[in-house]
Curated annotation (Swiss-Prot):
Binds to 23S rRNA. GO terms for cellular component: chloroplast; cytosolic large ribosomal subunit. This is Large ribosomal subunit protein uL14c. One of its GO terms (biological process) is translation. The keyword Transferase does not apply. It comes from Nandina domestica. It is found in: Plastid, Chloroplast. Keywords: Chloroplast, Plastid, Ribonucleoprotein, Ribosomal protein, RNA-binding, rRNA-binding. The lineage of its organism: Eukaryota, Viridiplantae, Streptophyta, Embryophyta, Tracheophyta. Belongs to the universal ribosomal protein uL14 family. Part of the 50S ribosomal subunit. One of its GO terms (molecular function) is structural constituent of ribosome.
């Protein structure tokens, strides 16, 4: 469960290291975002000499959350951190690599490019 002011790790090589959620895209007054939701975030920590700089406002899709994810078949998945992948306006990832495992639900939400870059899909 990601809400505004939540800090997230970045799971790609776009140049950002840490994000802070500002807004959840989709509804005007949604309180929490879950895996697969698009958020507006600000970069709190960035790698030097990369295209993305600190205090830049970007869009990101959530790929891992500490809160459990319950699937229809009864399986429960929980990750060790909250993480997101930086995307552009069309939904394509800004980086060329994705680090760590991501959830299978992203494929159903048409983030197939992120799923294909991921080393492990749970």
């Amino acid at each position: 469960m990601i809400q505004p002011q939540t800090h997230l790790n970045v799971a790609d090589n776009s140049g950002a290291r840490e994000l802070m959620c500002i807004r959840i895209i989709g509804a005007s007054n949604r309180r929490y975002a879950h895996i697969g939701d698009v958020i507006v975030a600000v970069i709190k920590e960035a790698v030097p000499h990369m295209p993305l700089q600190r205090s830049e406002v970007i869009r990101a899709v959530i790929v891992r959350t500490r809160k459990e994810l319950k699937r229809d078949n009864g399986m429960i998945i929980q990750y060790d951190d909250n993480a997101a992948v930086v995307i552009d306006q069309e939904g394509n990832p800004r980086g060329t690599r994705v680090f760590g495992a991501i959830a299978r639900e992203l494929r159903q939400l048409n983030f197939t490019k992120i799923v294909s870059l991921a080393p492990e899909v749970l």
